[in-house]
Every structure is written in C-alpha cells, then in structure tokens.
Amino acid sequence: MYLQRWLFSTNAKDIAILYFIFSTFCGLAGTAMSFIIRMELSAPGQQYLQGQNQLFNVLVTGHTILMVFFLVMPMLIGGFGNYYLPLMIGASDMSFARLNNISFWTLPPTLICLLTSTMVESGTGTGWTVYPPLSSIQSHSGASVDLAIFSLHLTTISSLLGTINFIVTALNMRTNGMTLHKMPLFTWSILITAVMLLMSLPVLSAGVTMLLMDRNFNTSFFEVQGGGDPILYQHLFWFFGHPEVYIMIVPTFGMMSHIVSTYSKKPVFGEISMIYTMGSISLLGFLVWSHHMYVVGLDTDTRAYFTSATMIITIPTSIKVFSWLTTIYGGSLRLTTPMLYTLSFLFLFTVGGLTGVVLANTSLDVAFHDTYYVVTHFHYVLSLGAVFSMFAGYYYWSPTVLGLNYNEKLSQIQFWLIFLGTNIIFFPMHFLGINGMPRRIPDYPDTFTGWNLVSSFGSMMTIMSLMLFTYIIYDQLMNGLTNKVNNKSINYMKTPDFIESNNIFLMNTTKSSSIEFMLNSPPTIHSFNTPTIQS
C-alpha cells in the first residue's frame, strides 16, 4: 500500500511532495557541481581538475541544467504549484490527476539521461545553450550530447503535461463566486507561467530536434557546409531561453505577494495591477530574445529594437517591486524567517535587475558579453531571487504541509549564513566581469586571484548554510511542535485579520489572505469535498 500510494498516486499533494523531494536531491547535486567549479577557480592555474578543461565545461553544463530544469521548475511549479493551486481556488484536486502523475514520473528518467550524458565519452561540455558547432558531431562525437538532448526532450514533455493540467485547473475548477479577478496572486502566477511554458517549450524542442538530426541523420539545419546556419539555432534557443527566465521568476512573484501581505498584515497594494504586470512581463519576455545575441552580427536597427524592448520590461517589474514596498509601508511588520527571505529577495532581485538594465544596452553588452558580469547578473536574479523565494516558500508553507513547526532561531541563522554566503560569491563577480574575466574558462590571469578567492570562500559559507538547512528539516520532522489541540488545527498562521476577525484560540496569530491556512494542517487528501463559496 505504501509503495502504491507514492508510485501510483493521483493525489496532487502527494505528487507535490514527490516533486519537492526530487528537486531537492537535484538541487544538492547541482550545488555540488557549482562547489567544484568554485574550488577550481579559487586560485589561478590547475587546481582540483588537473587541467581537464572539458570536465570543467561538463560541470558547468550539468550545474546549469540541473538547477534550471530539475530544481527551480519542478519545485516552484510542480511542488508549490501542485500543492497550493487546488487549495487556493477551492478545488478538491488537479483537473487531470493521472496526467499529473505521469508528468512527475517522466522526470527521473530525464535525470538519468542527463547524468549519463556527463559520463559517456568526454561528457557534454557545451554549456546549457548547446550551441552548434560546439555541440555538432565534429566537436562532440560521442553519444553524450544526444543523451543531453533526450533529457531536454523528456523534461519538455513533463513540463507540457503539467502545463495543460495547471491551465485547465485554474480556468475550470475555481470555486463558486471566484472570478479571475478574485483568484489569489500565486494561482495567477502559476497560470501565467503555464501559458509561457506552452508557448516556448515547442520552440526549444524544434531546435534540439534539428540538432539531433544534424548530428545523426546528416541534415544541415545548422551545418554551414550544407547551407545551414548556426545562428538559426541561437534564435530558436533564446526564443525559449528568455521566457524560461521569466518562467522561473514569475511563480516567485506570486509567492512574494502572499508572504509580504501575511507578515505586513495588509492586503497586497494594487492586486489587480499585480496580475496585469505579471501578464505584461510574460508577454514582453517573448519579444526580447535577441538581447542574448548582440555579438552574433545583428544589424544596428535590430539591436536598437531589442535594447529598447528589454528596457521596457523594467517598467512592469518596477511596478511590482514598488507595490510590495507599498504593502510593507505602514504595515504591522513581523521579521520572521519567510519575511527575511522575502525582503532580501526584493533587494537582491532589484540589484540583479539593475545589472540587467546595463546589459540591455548593446554597446555595453558587446564589452560584457560572456564575462562574469553576465554570470553575476543572472545569478542575482535566479540564485538570489528564485532560490531565496523557494526557501521563503518552504518556511512559510511547510507548517501547513507537515503540521509541524520548524526551529525559528536556527532558521534565522541559516538565512543570514546563506544571505552572506551568496552575496560573497556573486558580488565580487561584478568586478571580475567589468575587468573582462571570461565565463566557462577554468583558468585566469593572476590579476583576478583576489576576488575569485573571496567568491570561493562565499561558496563554502553557502554549503554550510545548506547543511544547516538539512538539519532544520530533520529537526522539524523529528522534534517539530504540532499545531493541534484536541485533534483540531490551531495553526498559528490562521485567517486574514483584514478580512475577518476569527481568532478563536486567542493566540498571537499571523494572518493570511488565502484559503489554505483555514484548513487542517496537514490538509486532508481531498480538502474540499463540499464546494466552498467565494464571497
């Protein structure tokens, strides 16, 4: 029965927990790869990889694909999305329960393909972009790139199946009276993300399928000798790749809105505008892909358009940031662990956005392209944006998932460790990038030694914070205080005080604006056997 529950589950909550476990494992593997990269770069010359430069690039590729496709997307969309989207709209489960199951179980074979690709021949040393001609049969002759492409195909299938499920559930299974404008912001963020996935993933599939054909069936889509063009691949990849960045960050916008609202004890400022800004960010995300390609020989008019369009994205993003700040302003602020992560997300996401504005300029990007300035830009947005919001989401919602509370003191120590560690890693990279240190190269001139050493020290701090985080989870599961009295949930995060005053147990409650905190914790398998009604 136990195996049957987890292998054949059609319950969204169980599948979400499987996603959490799987993505945590992949995240730790990706972190281990990044740690090896940072140790190799801690000093000039050969360090730990003993001059195996191909292995360095294999680690870079593995780290990126693991973090993007196996940590951020499965956790934010598959984990938090599966668990909380049905709860927030008053649905008993996802619309297609069996589809949900297969969309998860497509992922483990995908991971096996990816990890195998690193061990076949000399591994996939192409970076996550898999650009030809580096990824073509002349440069990577073995089966490694083919396995990586199969891995991308399978993860695309998994994401598309989940996407269909989320869209249908959000549009068709809302409770009575819940119009789209009354739908919670996190649900909106998952819906918008799902639409973006549906639009962008087929383009990636087309690109890597053509690459597979070039490698194995002698076609010439990207082979110059046969009349093909490798730049076409870059256009196809980045038409997926740029929306992908927003696919990773938009769910975090929804989570941040909930957490800011809860710990400020105020409704989110401008809730409708928050929905429209998410929509406009996702739409604009499809119109700016060539800003990744300023140095491939685009003409001046094209580059002028992409510079302007990229800068326009900062407008809806700024509206979101200032709306969060306005929500906090004048609120009854409680600096719990989730709120600390959220505040640091606001600050660090803004820093990452500002470096993005710099890179949007063609003239500057020509200088900064493929340097560590680009690396630190997207890590500030993703590593210190998306990942911090995952921690925030865990600390915010795990008491409702497990029915057990975590150790607040330890979790705040863990926050400060990872906050300092990640900033010590990535802030010095601005200076390295401005001075022209190139990406994906395992060696560098002596002049870059100082900041690289600082950066590698930050990596050690981050590893320590993750060790502490695993202990916090262990402590929560073993010793966490339950939120129940006489078998009734008295979860200290109860109903929203700006909607109603329902403080039955006279506790110092934290308020939330959505329905998931009004249920038992952990919630029952079908939380709403009787349909709820939205007032």
From Swiss-Prot:
One Gene Ontology term of the molecular function aspect: heme binding
Residues involved in O2 binding: Y246
Assigned GO CC terms: mitochondrial inner membrane; respiratory chain complex IV
Gene name of the encoded protein: COX1
Protein's recorded name: Cytochrome c oxidase subunit 1
Subunit structure: Component of the cytochrome c oxidase (complex IV, CIV), a multisubunit enzyme composed of a catalytic core of 3 subunits and several supernumerary subunits. The complex exists as a monomer or a dimer and forms supercomplexes (SCs) in the inner mitochondrial membrane with ubiquinol-cytochrome c oxidoreductase (cytochrome b-c1 complex, complex III, CIII).
Cofactors that this protein relies on: heme; Cu cation
Family as reported in the entry's similarity comment: Belongs to the heme-copper respiratory oxidase family.
Keywords, sorted A to Z: Calcium, Copper, Electron transport, Heme, Iron, Magnesium, Membrane, Metal-binding, Mitochondrion, Mitochondrion inner membrane, Respiratory chain, Translocase, Transmembrane, Transmembrane helix, Transport
Crosslink site: 1'-histidyl-3'-tyrosine (His-Tyr): H242-Y246
Positions of Fe(II)-heme a binding: H63, H379
